[in-house]
Amino acid sequence: MIITVGIDPGKSGAIAVVADGAQVLVANNVPTAGKNYLPAQMAALLLPFAALWRERDAPLRLLHTYTDLLDAVKNPDMPEEEFEQVYTWSEVALAAYMQQDDRAVLAMVEKQRGRKGEGPERLVQIGKGWGLWEGICATLCIPYEEVSGPKWERAMGCSTAASVSLTQKAGEEDKAFGKREKAAKAKAQRDKKHSHVAQAQALFPDCLVKANDDGLADALLLAVYAFRTYQGREQ
């Protein structure tokens, strides 16, 4: 069994863990509280898979049931019904995974970069989430790699065009052109996100990826990209 992890590390991002490129084990938005990341909850989502690098009966294999997972990450201030919507595991798939002797794992983390015009606070937030996920993978002995957005998007056949190039019309004022350009860029970004969601829905029809869950869609697609990358190296 090959376990792959896809991580979109932004605050509106997500994490997905997939078995053999087809079975979703974990599908979650990045745990946050307001402007803050929740590192303990983030780590708990990957903790069951740290045991891959231990002996089968090692003490580290603590979180091996759905109930244990829920207890590990539960926010005591979060209502039960809200919690169930935020954290999603496949209990049956996880149970089957824990019985496997022959397993391998690879995590793929999307590289982050600031955009033109973004301030220092935004750049710090980008780096913080990215660093937390890589630190969690390293601590849990889960091998990980970084991949740029355009690279995995091309490999997965996704739309990569989130920018546009417009020409200012004759007699068009700068302000009007700026508004038109801004609107066109926003539409291109929305179209790109929608295409990613559609592809994730096609690959995982049983996983409830909503129209605005582009972070979760990217995480699922990254996990599949990691699986295909691993397969290519083993051949």
Which positions does each model-derived feature cover?
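Phosphate- and other anionic-substrate recognition elements at nucleic-acid/protein interfaces
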Residues: M1-Q235
